[in-house]
């Protein structure tokens, strides 16, 4: 007897397993054959990326560029894949799978869901490209059964722009969730403090504000460092250049730890404060949720997708976006806390994660849909 198939389609292989690994394992444990569709990549990039028992289908796709001919070709590729595989359900993530994958699923008579993990470039301005993208999104969302959103502001924007029928929308209040056993609480007490930026290295993630803060704080305190963990993304329009990053590292302002697949050893270090002064269109920031789960204090901005991870003055500080001075002041506040006050912040982060971000709550929603 053939197993029923479920497809997960995203624009990066890493995101599928990093954000939805527990959901995928849950369905394989239930006896489904799970197929993952992701863009073509080098063999060296794939090593260790795909767990045993998961089938990967690579598809040619321009992840970030807007090219109608390339996008049409991508649409027909996934249309053929869905026709051949005949899955019982498809989960789409990110803009191109959400649009073209949802249409392809509908044409094949396959039930599907889409997830918008933050509103990207298509919703930031009124350029012709953005208007076309929003129009395509409306078509795609007519073809899908469910649309997952991760915060209330995104929900308001989607309703205001009439992108999707409200009856189809599910708000995941705890984002995509965190495995609270995998990301366990660790003692954070230390006299030496590291303010850690985790994420794609984009100006919109608050890179300039982070660097400006580092320059000032390092003049005032000796036992402090500012570290960045993440990747450069040259495909993104507002990405920090390799040259700029190297310049800030060589000046001694920041340290760069590169990219790691497993961040737990980083979180296991003592004296970590996860600091993300983002003004990017977040869904619900994964790194901040993981930081909460491991008991790290948070400094982040009062924007959708970030503010949900911090209770100001309780487990960290919530500051205005695009405000280096506010970030500097928040860092000063943390540096001047007593050991006991820092410990209470760490404990409060873990409590917040247990209250809001448990992955089991998300898995229950996936189960109800299928």
Task: Identify the function of each model-found stretch.
Residues 57, 138, 142-185:
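Donor nucleotide-sugar binding/catalytic pocket of nucleotide-sugar-dependent glycosyltransferases
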Residues 312-313, 317-325, 333-339:
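Conserved acidic donor-binding segment of nucleotide-sugar-dependent glycosyltransferases
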Residues 17-22, 193, 202-216, 325, ...:
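A conserved mid-protein helix/loop that constitutes part of the nucleotide-sugar donor-binding site
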Residues 92-98, 116:
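Short His-centered aromatic/hydrophobic patch
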Residues 37-43, 198, 225-240:
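Glycosyltransferase donor-sugar binding loop
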Residues 230, 239-259:
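Nucleotide-activated donor-binding/catalytic signature segment of Leloir-type glycosyltransferases, i.e.
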Residues 274-275, 297-300:
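Short hydrophobic beta-strand element within catalytic cores of glycosyltransferases
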